[in-house]
Regions:
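Beta-rich nucleic-acid/ligand-interaction surfaces
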Residues: 119, 131-156
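Short amphipathic alpha-helices in soluble, non-transmembrane regions
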Residues: 121-126
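Conserved, surface-exposed functional patches that form binding/active-site neighborhoods
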Residues: 158-189
Length: 203
């Protein structure tokens, strides 16, 4: 997909958004093209990471007649989500502040069959000479109190533009199918609790 097409898609996404605060709308009004471009760069970074895992999966299929990856999911944090996180962490509401201060704008989730595949794939990814590890959090060996388990990596990878190379951060989450199911149930439970609390306050 061409960068121009990605920019157009992001612009349409901005137009459809209607739940932003006045402060966020003012930021976008002043920085709409830089923000669009930044989001497009994150989408490009996601494509790079997805390609790396697809290549690894294909290699294992050819050499060992099995696929360690069950599925690959990706997402870009919403504008409202970016803004709320910036406010919560006192990150400057600027393009530079957002890019430097929020590490999980771009996310890729790799669902594996077995726990050992998680560490094997993480090692394969980090051995690649264009991948830089920024942060590692192992919630498999050290689960959260809720029971949530996953391996989180923040990495930097290059995207190659027309006239430059730009390093972009991507959060990569590794889970088994069972871990992903538990995370989904936990997320729904938290969302339901927040909704009930809001309804109670409203009454």
């Amino acid at each position: 997909m061409l960068l121009e097409e990605i920019l157009k898609q992001e612009q349409e996404r901005f137009i459809k958004e209607n739940l932003l605060s006045d402060e966020m709308l003012e930021l976008l009004k002043e920085n709409i093209m830089p923000f669009n471009t930044l989001m497009a760069y994150y989408r490009c970074a996601i494509m790079e990471v997805e390609t790396k895992f697809k290549v690894l999966n294909e290699e294992f299929s050819l050499q060992y007649d099995r696929n360690p990856i069950e599925s690959i999911k990706s997402r870009i944090k919403s504008m409202d989500g970016i803004f709320k996180k910036a406010k919560k962490k006192n990150i400057p509401i600027t393009m530079e502040g957002i890019e430097e201060g929020i590490r999980d704008i771009a996310g890729v989730r790799v669902i594996c069959s077995f726990p050992e595949d998680i560490y094997m794939l993480a090692d394969c990814l980090l051995k690649q000479d264009d991948v830089v590890l920024v942060e590692r959090k192992d919630y498999i060996k050290n689960p959260k109190p809720s029971g949530y388990r996953s391996l989180h990596l923040i990495i930097e990878i290059p995207i190659f533009l027309q006239n430059e190379k730009k390093m972009m951060k991507v959060e990569v989450q590794f889970r088994t199918i069972a871990m992903d199911f538990w995370a989904s149930v936990e997320h729904k439970a938290v969302s339901y609790t927040h909704l009930r609390a809001h309804e109670t306050r409203g009454n």
